[in-house]
C-alpha cells in the first residue's frame, strides 16, 4: 500500500469510527458491533473505499498484541500459577470438546475429514479481542467467571502452535525428517527471551525512567511490545503470546501503571482498527449465495460453544448467575481462524468456497456476541430479582486501594506509615525512581508514574478508592491533580499538602478544605513548647495553640476574595489584635483554674 493510499485508508478508518461508534452506542448495540458495521460499510463489499483488506487485517492484529501486553501486566507469575488448573483443565477441555463436535458436524457436509479437523479447531477458538473487551464492559474482570474466561483464552493462544503444526501433517506435505535442530534453536531462543526479560527489563526501564523524559519511556514501551511480537513471529509462534509474557515479566515491577498508561491509547485505536478490518473482510457475495448454509452454521457454532462452555462452567463450580455470561462472551469464532484457515488453504485442504464460508461464519458469529450479551444481561436482571443462594458469594480479588497517596517523600512517607500501621490498603504514586526502589524494599506498594495522567490514576484504582492524599512537591502539580480528581473522580475525598499560605489559599478556592501546611503545624507545635519553657502552664499553652490555629484558618477563609497586599496587611493587624484579646481573657481565666484541662475541638 503506497503512502497516499495509506493516508486515505487512515482517514477513512477514523471517519468510520467517529461516525459509527457513537451511533452504535446511542442505539445500545455497543462499540464493538459499531466497529464491525463500519468495516462492512467502507469495505470492498460495501461502499468500496478500501480494497486491500488482507494487509490491513494483518496490521490491525497489533491491537490484540497491545491488549495481551496489558493483560499480562495485570497478572504476576504467582497469580498465573494459581490459574494453571483452569488454563490446562477448562481451557483444554473447551478446545477439544468444541473442536470434536464442530469437526463432526462439518464432516456431515462436503468437508473432507482433514478439512473438518482444521475447521473444527479454528471454530473452537474465541476472539481474544472481543471477549476481553466485553468482559471489561460487563465488569467481569475480577469475577470468577472472568478469571475462568481469561484462562480459556490463554490456553487458546497456547494452542495456536500445535494447530499450525498440524496443517502440513493433515495435508500430507510434512517433511519426512523432523528438523530437531530447528526446533531446538526455537526453544533456546524462547528460553533466552524469558531469562533476558526476567533480569534485564527492570534495569533498562530504571535507566530510562532516570532520564525524566516521558516520551522516551513511551517509546521504550512501544519498542518492548513490538519487539517481542516480532521476535515471536520470527519463531513461528503467536505474537500475542510473546507480548503477554513480556507483560507478565513486568507485572510486579514499579513501572506497571506507567506502562499501562503509555500503551492504552495505542491499544484502543488498534483494537478499533482490528474490528473494522474484520467487518471489511465479510464476503457479502458468499453470504448472499449460501445464505441458508451460513445462517445455520452461525446458529450451530454459537449454540455448540455456548453449551460446551456452560457445562464446563457448571463442572468448575461457577455460580449459576455467572455461567451464561461466561458462555456467551466466548461463544463466537476468533481472529485465529483467519490465520489457520489461510494456512490450510495454502496447503489445499479446502475446496471451492469452503474457506470463504468458514470465514463468513466466524465474522457473523462475532457480530452476534454483543447482541447475545444484551440478552444475557436482560436474563440476569430478571434472575437477580429472585432470592440469592446463601452459599453463593461473589468472588472478588479485594486488592483495590482505599487510599491513593501521591508523592512519597518525607511528608508522604509519614502518612503512608500511619495508614499501613492501621491496616489500610494504599497505592502510592511517585515520580522519583530512587524513592520507588527504596520504599519497595520495605514492602510498600509503590509505583513509578506521573499522577497527573488521568489513565494512570484510573489504572491505579482511583475509581474504587475512597480518598486521595496529595503530597506533591510542586504546587502546580497539586492544583492540577485536584482539578483532575474533581472532573474525573468526583467521589474521591481529597486531602492535600500545602507548602505555604499561598498554596493553602489556592486549595480553599478549589474547594479543598482538608489540607495541612507542613511548616505551620510543626512551627505551631514548637511554639507551644516554647511557651511552656517560658513558664506558661501546659494546658494554657495548648489553648493558645488551638486559638491561634482557629483564627489563622478563619483568616485564610476571609482573605480568599481579597487580592491586594494592603487589604491583607490590614486584616492581619486586626487578627493580631483579636488574638491578643483572646489570650488576655484566657490568662485571666487560667489564673482562676490553673490545673484544669478543657476539652476542645
Curated annotation (Swiss-Prot):
Family annotation (InterPro entries): Cation/H_exchanger_TM, K/H_exchanger, K_H_efflux_KefB, Na+/solute_symporter_sf, NAD(P)-bd_dom_sf, RCK_N
Location within or outside the cell: Cell inner membrane
Domain RCK N-terminal: 400-519
One BP term from GO: proton transmembrane transport
Transmembrane segments: 4-24, 29-49, 55-75, 87-107, 115-135, 152-172, 177-197, 207-227, 230-250, 262-282, 284-304, 324-344, 356-376
One MF annotation (Gene Ontology) recorded for this entry: glutathione-regulated potassium exporter activity
GO cellular component: plasma membrane
UniProtKB keywords: Antiport, Cell inner membrane, Cell membrane, Ion transport, Membrane, Potassium, Potassium transport, Transmembrane, Transmembrane helix, Transport
Bilayer topology term: Multi-pass membrane protein
SUPFAM superfamilies in UniProt: NAD(P)-binding Rossmann-fold domains (SSF51735)
Family of this protein: Belongs to the monovalent cation:proton antiporter 2 (CPA2) transporter (TC 2.A.37) family. KefB subfamily.
Subunit structure: Interacts with the regulatory subunit KefG.
PANTHER family associated with the record: K(+) EFFLUX ANTIPORTER 3, CHLOROPLASTIC (PTHR46157:SF4)
Biological role: Pore-forming subunit of a potassium efflux system that confers protection against electrophiles. Catalyzes K(+)/H(+) antiport.
Designated name of the protein: Glutathione-regulated potassium-efflux system protein KefB
Organism listed in the record: Citrobacter koseri (strain ATCC BAA-895 / CDC 4225-83 / SGSC4696)
Amino acid at each position: 500500500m503506497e503512502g497516499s493510499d495509506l493516508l486515505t485508508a487512515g482517514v477513512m478508518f477514523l471517519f468510520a469510527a467517529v461516525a459509527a461508534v457513537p451511533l452504535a452506542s446511542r442505539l445500545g448495540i455497543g462499540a464493538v458491533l459499531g466497529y464491525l458495521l463500519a468495516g462492512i460499510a467502507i469495505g470492498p463489499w460495501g461502499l468500496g473505499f478500501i480494497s486491500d483488506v488482507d494487509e490491513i487485517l494483518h496490521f490491525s492484529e497489533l491491537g490484540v498484541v497491545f491488549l495481551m501486553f496489558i493483560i499480562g501486566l495485570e497478572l504476576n507469575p504467582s497469580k498465573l500459577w494459581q490459574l494453571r488448573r483452569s488454563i490446562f483443565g477448562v481451557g483444554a477441555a473447551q478446545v477439544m470438546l468444541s473442536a470434536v463436535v464442530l469437526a463432526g458436524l462439518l464432516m456431515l457436509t462436503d468437508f473432507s475429514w482433514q478439512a473438518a479437523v482444521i475447521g473444527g479447531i479454528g471454530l473452537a477458538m474465541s476472539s481474544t479481542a472481543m471477549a476481553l473487551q466485553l468482559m471489561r464492559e460487563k465488569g467481569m474482570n475480577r469475577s470468577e467467571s472472568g478469571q475462568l474466561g481469561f484462562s480459556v483464552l490463554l490456553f487458546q493462544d497456547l494452542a495456536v502452535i500445535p494447530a499450525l503444526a498440524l496443517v502440513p501433517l493433515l495435508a500430507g506435505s510434512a517433511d519426512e525428517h523432523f528438523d530437531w535442530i530447528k526446533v531446538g534453536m526455537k526453544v533456546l531462543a524462547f528460553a533466552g527471551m524469558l531469562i533476558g526479560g526476567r533480569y534485564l527489563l527492570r534495569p533498562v526501564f530504571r535507566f530510562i525512567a532516570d532520564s525524566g523524559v516521558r516520551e522516551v519511556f513511551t517509546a521504550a514501551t512501544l519498542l518492548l511490545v513490538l519487539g517481542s511480537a516480532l521476535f515471536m513471529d520470527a519463531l513461528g509462534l503467536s505474537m500475542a503470546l510473546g507480548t503477554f509474557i513480556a507483560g507478565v515479566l513486568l507485572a510486579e515491577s514499579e513501572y506497571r501503571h506507567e506502562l499501562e498508561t503509555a500503551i492504552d491509547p495505542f491499544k484502543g485505536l488498534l483494537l478499533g482498527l482490528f474490528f473494522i478490518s474484520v467487518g471489511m473482510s465479510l464476503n457479502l457475495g458468499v453470504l448472499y449465495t449460501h445464505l441458508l448454509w451460513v445462517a445455520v452454521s452461525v446458529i450451530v457454532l454459537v449454540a455448540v460453544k455456548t453449551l460446551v462452555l456452560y457445562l464446563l462452567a457448571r463442572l468448575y463450580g461457577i455460580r449459576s448467575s455467572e455461567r451464561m455470561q461466561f458462555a456467551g462472551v466466548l461463544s463466537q469464532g476468533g481472529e485465529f481462524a483467519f490465520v489457520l484457515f489461510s494456512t490450510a488453504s495454502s496447503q489445499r485442504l479446502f475446496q471451492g468456497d469452503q474457506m470463504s464460508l468458514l470465514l463468513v461464519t466466524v465474522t457473523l458469529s462475532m457480530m452476534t456476541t454483543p447482541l447475545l450479551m444484551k440478552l444475557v444481561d436482560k436474563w440476569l436482571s430478571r434472575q437477580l430479582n429472585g432470592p440469592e443462594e446463601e452459599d453463593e458469594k461473589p468472588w472478588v480479588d479485594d486488592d483495590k486501594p482505599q487510599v491513593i497517596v501521591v508523592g512519597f517523600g518525607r511528608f508522604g512517607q509519614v502518612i503512608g506509615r500511619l495508614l499501613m500501621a492501621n491496616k489500610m490498603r494504599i497505592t502510592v504514586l511517585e515520580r522519583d525512581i530512587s524513592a520507588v526502589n527504596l520504599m519497595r524494599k520495605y514492602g510498600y506498594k509503590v509505583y513509578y508514574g506521573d499522577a497527573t495522567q488521568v489513565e494512570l490514576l484510573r489504572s491505579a484504582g482511583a475509581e474504587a478508592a475512597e480518598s486521595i492524599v496529595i503530597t506533591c512537591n510542586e504546587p502546580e502539580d497539586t492544583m492540577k491533580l485536584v482539578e483532575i480528581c474533581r472532573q474525573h473522580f468526583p467521589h474521591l475525598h481529597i486531602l492535600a499538602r500545602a507548602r505555604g499560605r499561598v498554596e493553602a489559599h489556592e486549595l480553599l478556592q478549589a474547594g479543598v478544605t482538608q489540607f495541612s501546611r507542613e511548616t505551620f503545624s510543626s512551627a505551631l507545635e514548637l511554639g507551644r513548647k516554647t511557651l511552656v519553657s517560658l513558664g506558661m502552664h501546659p494546658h494554657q499553652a495548648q489553648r493558645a495553640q488551638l486559638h491561634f490555629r482557629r483564627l489563622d484558618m478563619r483568616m485564610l477563609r476571609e482573605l480568599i476574595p481579597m487580592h491586594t497586599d494592603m487589604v491583607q496587611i490590614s486584616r492581619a493587624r486586626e487578627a493580631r489584635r483579636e488574638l491578643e484579646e483572646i489570650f488576655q481573657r484566657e490568662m485571666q481565666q487560667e489564673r482562676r483554674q490553673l490545673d484544669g484541662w478543657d476539652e476542645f475541638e
